[in-house]
């Protein structure tokens, strides 16, 4: 399953909406995705599954790329 992760690049800084970034990653569950990203210095704000029409919409975006970690 593909998940979209909203995050801040530096876990030590307070989250600011304008600096929120996102990435797409494959995983079995939200917990699996968080475990895969645990070694990164990210402040993870939100993880959501991307399926169906939402996935098709995201794939049409030129920024869509599934990250392998």
Curated annotation (Swiss-Prot):
GO cellular component: DNA-directed RNA polymerase complex
GO biological-process terms attached to the record: DNA-templated transcription
Keywords: DNA-directed RNA polymerase, Nucleotidyltransferase, Transcription, Transferase
Documented EC number(s): 2.7.7.6
Reactions this protein catalyses: RNA(n) + a ribonucleoside 5'-triphosphate = RNA(n+1) + diphosphate
MF GO annotations: DNA binding; DNA-directed RNA polymerase activity
InterPro entries hit by this protein: RpoY
Self-association and partners: RNAP is composed of a core of 2 alpha, a beta and a beta' subunit. The core is associated with a delta subunit, and at least one of epsilon or omega. When a sigma factor is associated with the core the holoenzyme is formed, which can initiate transcription.
Family: Belongs to the RNA polymerase subunit epsilon family.
Function field: A non-essential component of RNA polymerase (RNAP).
Name of this chain's protein: DNA-directed RNA polymerase subunit epsilon
Source organism of this protein record: Shouchella clausii (strain KSM-K16)
Lineage: Bacteria, Bacillati, Bacillota, Bacilli, Bacillales
């Amino acid at each position: 399953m593909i998940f979209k992760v909203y995050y801040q690049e530096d876990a030590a800084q307070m989250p600011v909406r304008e600096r929120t970034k996102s990435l797409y990653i494959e995983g079995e569950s939200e917990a699996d995705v968080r475990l895969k990203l645990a070694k990164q210095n990210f402040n993870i704000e939100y993880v959501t599954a991307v399926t169906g029409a939402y996935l098709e919409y995201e794939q049409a975006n030129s920024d869509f790329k599934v990250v392998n970690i």
